[in-house]
């Protein structure tokens, strides 16, 4: 099981939440943590996770999850409601960059994702979630590449694929309906021709009989 699947199962599923995406990060400025109970300073992995509740009305949140060295479990650390997110800074709109900043009402973090592509995927999901679930005040996305905001995102591509499939299916049904319609018209014409032939034959038979 991947780390993200394990986080979804351990952290969010028990609370009836659904994890939409996650990105593994490190602070751009190294920040020490307090000594652990064992007396030593712990190394850890950090994940920024985006989730929504399964119950209506849907609430979205961003959660910081950590996994300490030597442990197989994950720990929920900080959490913010999506409404508290004020700004998402992609740092450089002209190139793939793993760096980004998140500004909340009461917190500001500077991160480096494990890869630029992982950051890009998380940003696409985050932007889509903000557009879908936030109606009033949406966070500002600055210094982000156009593929995050525009039609090249994986979410838009998936939507386009579904739309294309529906359009193709609809077109196929329309063409089939047209073929059936033409067949029905042809059958009706043949029926009328047969009736006319029968009437003509009947008239000829009556004429010769007379």
UniProtKB/Swiss-Prot annotation:
Compartments where found: Cytoplasm; Membrane
Organism: Mus musculus (Mouse)
Pfam families listed in its UniProt record: Sec3-PIP2_bind, Synaptobrevin
Residue ranges constituting the v-SNARE coiled-coil homology domain according to the UniProt record: 151-210
Record has Magnesium as a keyword: no
Keyword flag Coiled coil: yes
Entry keyword set: Acetylation, Coiled coil, Cytoplasm, Membrane
Organism lineage string: Eukaryota, Metazoa, Chordata, Craniata, Vertebrata
Entry GO terms, CC: cytoplasm; membrane
Domain of life: Eukaryota
Stated name of the protein: Syntaxin-binding protein 6
GO-annotated biological processes: regulation of SNARE complex assembly; SNARE complex assembly
Quaternary structure and interacting proteins, as annotated: Part of a ternary complex containing SNAP25 and STX1A that can be dissociated by NAPA and NSF. Interacts with STX4A.
Entry-annotated residues carrying N-acetylserine: 2
Membrane topology: Peripheral membrane protein
This protein's encoding gene: Stxbp6
